[in-house]
């Protein structure tokens, strides 16, 4: 199963032509390239918590009569950032549109995790160039993780001068000011902060639905895996205060939301940066068990920080679901060491044993990289054997993609691309084989499903997910959308289940 890019829409307006200039001055003042050495000097600058977000009077009705469109690439964190930007646009008076043709402002919220994602963004910028020619007042912006990479911003400035604004991951709350500057500037507005970022509370949000919601519990990552750009693009680990998180989730529950996914680049490190209290993800999850909401999930986990207390709390069940996404990346201890994952094959397998002991019906999924520099046949076979031993339900699988500025990008690699592709094919065959075997076991079982809406493939069919994150398709009245129902599984496919309704909506206790 390969990564699927999620696309979200929404969006806004105006700008002027630009001259060719030396843009190096922007990087001298507000931008630094990714640097492992500099990034590891973290902790000297205090992380501020801002609770007073508000729009100054000058921005009242700033966007009245204008429309905005946001295209989102990448992870759930980006999706949630898009919800925040949509909230700011709406507060400014803008209206969303689902067409770039109708938009006054187009933002591309980007992902830097793999080269393929970057290529898609530059391809889209090429398409937007003709739109800009037809509408010189259109504002085009690039934000998100790609904007935190100096080489990417240089490329935008040199080859995509129709872009009006570039901003990063740490200053979304400054979107009104960036829009205003871009609207009246003759040059591309570049505002990319090299500081590690603060925690900004009370930002407006326009959520994509009223059934499920993302809730950030922390930002950034300090793990510095050798292949990963995220610690540079998202900054150091910084946690939201538990009272702010719990208040937000209680508010969502009161407004009828049924499922919450707690977000962080490394959620298991939650609370490790607190200096006044000893409080981690296990403590937070234990408190969230008491909130009147049907389901609580979290992503993404790092095996290194997955502690016994969290496992104990998850074993209590209730509204804490039995699905855990636990990226392993490789089954070879030697490869894991080169990746700087800071755990071994044996440590990972012991963690899995503890999880399954505490949560017997736990469903585990994972991420795996193949073709890391100099990966041997034997090391790849260790990944295959670990996959079988754990018995994952599915996995996101990737061929290693070098990211400029990371240590792995400098490693010599003697593995031909043909070999990497062959390994990926073999791994995917195993993933598919185990996926259908796991799903077959659901036949005849009755499962709880949260109904998301109509199936993408058939509007006459409803679709939803189990507590273990299995997609289920079934025929039922559309009035059940947003409800928890009981479904008897009648058929299993590789990536989904089919079933029939056996019970009306379930009351959430």
UniProtKB/Swiss-Prot annotation:
Name where it's found.
Cytoplasm
Family as reported in the entry's similarity comment:
Belongs to the methylthiotransferase family. MiaB subfamily.
The answer to whether UniProt assigns keyword Cell inner membrane to this entry is no
Gene that encodes the chain: miaB
Origin species, per record, is Bacillus anthracis
Q: Cite the binding residues for [4Fe-4S] cluster 1.
A: 75, 111, 145
Which cystines does this chain contain? none
Co-factor note (free text): Binds 2 [4Fe-4S] clusters. One cluster is coordinated with 3 cysteines and an exchangeable S-adenosyl-L-methionine.
Q: Where is the Radical SAM core domain?
A: 207-437
Key words of the record: 4Fe-4S, Cytoplasm, Iron, Iron-sulfur, Metal-binding, S-adenosyl-L-methionine, Transferase, tRNA processing
| Chain's role | Catalyzes the methylthiolation of N6-(dimethylallyl)adenosine (i(6)A), leading to the formation of 2-methylthio-N6-(dimethylallyl)adenosine (ms(2)i(6)A) at position 37 in tRNAs that read codons beginning with uridine.
Swiss-Prot/TrEMBL cofactor(s): [4Fe-4S] cluster
Outline the subunit composition. Answer: Monomer.
Organism lineage reads as:
Bacteria, Bacillati, Bacillota, Bacilli, Bacillales
Annotated protein name in UniProt: tRNA-2-methylthio-N(6)-dimethylallyladenosine synthase
**What's an example of a GO molecular-function annotation for this chain?**
4 iron, 4 sulfur cluster binding
**Top-rank EC class of the record's enzyme:** transferase
Q: NCBIfam families from the xrefs?
A: miaB-methiolase, MiaB/RimO family radical SAM methylthiotransferase
């Amino acid at each position: 199963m390969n990564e699927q890019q999620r696309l979200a829409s929404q969006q806004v307006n105006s700008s002027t032509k630009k001259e060719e200039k030396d843009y190096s001055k922007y990087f001298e003042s507000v931008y630094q390239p990714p640097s492992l050495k500099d990034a590891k000097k973290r902790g000297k600058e205090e992380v501020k918590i801002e609770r007073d977000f508000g729009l100054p009077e000058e921005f009242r009705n700033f966007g009245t009569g204008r429309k905005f469109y946001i295209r989102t690439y990448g992870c759930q964190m980006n999706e949630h950032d898009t919800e925040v930007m949509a909230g700011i646009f709406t507060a400014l008076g803008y209206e969303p549109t689902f067409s770039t043709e109708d938009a006054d402002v187009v933002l591309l919220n980007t992902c830097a995790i793999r080269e393929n994602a970057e290529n898609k963004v530059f391809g889209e910028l090429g398409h937007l160039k003709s739109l800009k020619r037809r509408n010189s007042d259109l504002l085009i912006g690039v934000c998100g993780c790609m904007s935190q990479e100096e080489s990417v911003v240089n490329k935008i400035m040199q080859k995509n001068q129709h872009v009006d604004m570039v901003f990063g991951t740490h200053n979304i709350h400054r979107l009104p000011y960036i829009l205003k500057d871009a609207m009246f500037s003759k040059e591309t507005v570049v505002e990319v902060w090299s500081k590690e970022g603060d925690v900004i509370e009370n930002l407006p949000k326009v959520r994509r639905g009223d059934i499920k919601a993302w809730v950030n519990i922390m930002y950034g990552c300090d793990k510095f895996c050798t292949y990963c750009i995220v610690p540079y693009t998202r900054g150091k680990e910084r946690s939201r205060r538990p009272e702010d998180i719990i208040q937000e989730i209680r508010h969502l529950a009161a407004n009828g939301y049924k499922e919450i996914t707690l977000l962080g680049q490394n959620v298991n490190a939650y609370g490790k940066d607190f200096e006044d209290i000893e409080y981690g993800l296990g403590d937070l999850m234990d408190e969230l068990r008491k909130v009147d909401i049907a389901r609580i999930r979290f992503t993404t986990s790092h095996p290194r920080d997955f502690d016994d207390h969290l496992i104990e709390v998850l074993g209590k069940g209730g509204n804490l679901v039995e699905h855990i996404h636990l990226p392993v990346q490789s089954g070879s201890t030697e490869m894991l060491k080169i990746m700087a994952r800071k755990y071994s094959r044996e440590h990972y397998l012991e963690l899995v044993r503890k999880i399954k002991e505490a949560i017997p019906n736990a469903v585990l999924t994972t991420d795996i990289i193949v073709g890391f520099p100099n990966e041997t046949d034997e090391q790849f076979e260790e990944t295959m054997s670990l996959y079988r031993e754990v018995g994952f339900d599915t996995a996101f699988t990737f061929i290693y993609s070098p990211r400029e500025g990371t240590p792995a990008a400098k490693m010599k690699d003697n593995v031909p691309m043909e070999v990497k592709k062959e390994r990926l094919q073999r791994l995917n065959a195993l993933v598919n084989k185990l996926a259908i075997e796991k799903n077959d076991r659901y036949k005849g079982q009755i499962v709880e499903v949260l109904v998301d809406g109509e199936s993408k493939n058939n509007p006459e069919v409803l679709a939803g997910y189990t507590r273990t994150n299995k997609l289920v398709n079934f025929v039922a009245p559309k009035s059940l959308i947003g409800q928890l129902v009981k479904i008897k599984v009648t058929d299993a496919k590789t990536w989904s289940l089919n079933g029939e309704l056996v019970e009306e909506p379930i009351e959430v206790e």
